[in-house]
Structures are given as structure tokens and as C-alpha cells.
């Protein structure tokens, strides 16, 4: 999460400015919440969604969103706020009923806090268990600019594969938005995209660019010596001595990271035409 001593707003302002110039709407999404909201590698947590248990983490979470909302309350480039990315992984089976209940309570508290400073923007609530479970929601009438957001990977491509999302959307009579999907073949991407559109579910595919060919619209060329970093992550680092022994040459690692930053620039990426066509866009 962005804190008072960081330059997060400067970075956000720059990116939002680029999007405004390009005519692109922005959805602000919190991927790494205080304490961790998921309990897996995507939220930099300690392998548990402590945000759902810790009052201080929850206070900071709400404060961050309130500061963001206050700053951007009248910004028309921002479409809305996606409060949490993929909260509460499915691993914690015995704890899920309690964690999911705490999530709904936190969503409501955060939404009401945001509305004190921003009555304009859409607020998006993701389902629990990888944005896939909406069955625990009991209240969706406390805000009139609210919608839900789902994620789905590695499923079928027909209507049945999203029927649970359709059923929940129709039950609550609020929009459902597919905030993440993809990571599949061009054929799968096209069929699933068409199914979403036929069922009036908006979408964004993940990711835009990646260092894996055919996983996005753009491919980042792999830097020289990048495999040194990859191999280091696979080695035994169970004590500090093994960490030191496994550590690769730091100059080569530094060069690989700097080369990555250079390769990530649009002009140096490779366009994946098949994936782009599958999304119904011109390559």
C-alpha cells in the first residue's frame, strides 16, 4: 500500500496523465493491501490474508483508499476503484467462512468512508477466492454506484463457464465486470471474449505485456543473464550461508535488471498479433 512517506501519488499522476492523453479510462486497483489480502505470492504477504484479521491493517487500508478518493474525486479519467485484488485464497478452508464475512464488512466500511470524500466514482467489489466466490455477500444496497468484478482463468469458453457470475449479477441487479482473464491460447481468448460480450459482461485481459510469448498483446524480450536470476530463485536458500553461496554475480544481475527496464519500453516489445486479433482489436 502507498504510505505517507512514499511518492505513490506522483507515479499515479503521471500514469493517469498518460491515459488521459491516450483517451483511456483508468481503474485503480489495490494489489498489495496492508497485511496482505490474499495470502499468496501476488500480495507480498506472509502467506495469510492478515488484512481480514488485523484492525490496524484495516484502518490503514481504509485510510489509503480515502486519501486516493479525496485526491481524485473529480478526475474524469478514472472510471472507478477496485478495492481489493483477489482477496482470500482458497487454501484456508477452515477459516473461509470467517474471513469472507470479514471481507464483506471491510468492503462496506471502506465504501462508506470513500463516499464521504468522493460521491462520483464507481466502486468495484471483487469476490473472495481469486475473485470467484460471491456467495457470501448479503448486502449490496448501501451504495448506488457499486458493481462487482470477477476473474476467471483456465475454464471452458461457453456460457456455462461463467453461469455463476451471471446468476449472481442477475440476483443483485448490478453490473459484473471480468477484471482479469487470459493466459491461454488465441483460440480460447477469442471464444471466451465473445461469450463475455454476448452476456453483457465487460472485460479486461491480463496481462498487457509479459516476458512470455503469446500470453498478452506484447512480449518483452528476455534480457541477457536473466536466467541467472531465475536459477537463483530455485536454489536452496534455507539459511544465510546458502543464500550467500547461491547468489549470482551482482554486476550481471544489475545489468539484467537494467536491460529489463529498457526491454519493457513499448518500442522494444514485440507485438503478438494473434492475441490482439483474438481480443477483437486491430494489431
Region roles according to the model:
Residues 54, 183-185, 249-250, 254:
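Intrinsic-disorder/low-complexity, polar/charged segments
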Residues 195, 199-283:
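Extended, alpha-helix-rich binding/interface surfaces that flank or overlap catalytic cores
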Residues 3-7, 158, 185, 239:
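Alpha-helix capping and helix-coil boundary motifs
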Amino acid at each position: 500500500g502507498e504510505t505517507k512517506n512514499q511518492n505513490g501519488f506522483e507515479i499515479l499522476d503521471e500514469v493517469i496523465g498518460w491515459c488521459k492523453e491516450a483517451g483511456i479510462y483508468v481503474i485503480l486497483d489495490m494489489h498489495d493491501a496492508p497485511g496482505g489480502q490474499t495470502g499468496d505470492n501476488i500480495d507480498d504477504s506472509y502467506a495469510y490474508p492478515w488484512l481480514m484479521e488485523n484492525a490496524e491493517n484495516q484502518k490503514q487500508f481504509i485510510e489509503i483508499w480515502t486519501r486516493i478518493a479525496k485526491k481524485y474525486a473529480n478526475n474524469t479519467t478514472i472510471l472507478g476503484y477496485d478495492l481489493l485484488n483477489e482477496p482470500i485464497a482458497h487454501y484456508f478452508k477452515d477459516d473461509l467462512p470467517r474471513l469472507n464475512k470479514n471481507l464483506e464488512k471491510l468492503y462496506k466500511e471502506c465504501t462508506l468512508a470513500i463516499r464521504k470524500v468522493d460521491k462520483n466514482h464507481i466502486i468495484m467489489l471483487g469476490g473472495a477466492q481469486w475473485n470467484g466466490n460471491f456467495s457470501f455477500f448479503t448486502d449490496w444496497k448501501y451504495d448506488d454506484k457499486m458493481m462487482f468484478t470477477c476473474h476467471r482463468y483456465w475454464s471452458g469458453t461457453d456460457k456455462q463457464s461463467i453461469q455463476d457470475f451471471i446468476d449472481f449479477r442477475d440476483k443483485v441487479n448490478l453490473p459484473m465486470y471480468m477484471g482479469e482473464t487470459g493466459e491461454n491460447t488465441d483460440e480460447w481468448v477469442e471464444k471466451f471474449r465473445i461469450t463475455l460480450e454476448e452476456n453483457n459482461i465487460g472485460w479486461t485481459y491480463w496481462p498487457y505485456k509479459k516476458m512470455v510469448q503469446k500470453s498478452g498483446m506484447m512480449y518483452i524480450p528476455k534480457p541477457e543473464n536473466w536466467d541467472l536470476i531465475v536459477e537463483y530463485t530455485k536454489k536452496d536458500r534455507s539459511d544465510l550461508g546458502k543464500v550467500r553461496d547461491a547468489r549470482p554475480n551482482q554486476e550481471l544481475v544489475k545489468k539484467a535488471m537494467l536491460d529489463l527496464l529498457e526491454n519493457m519500453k513499448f518500442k522494444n516489445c514485440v507485438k503478438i498479433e494473434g492475441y490482439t486479433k483474438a481480443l477483437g482489436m486491430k494489431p
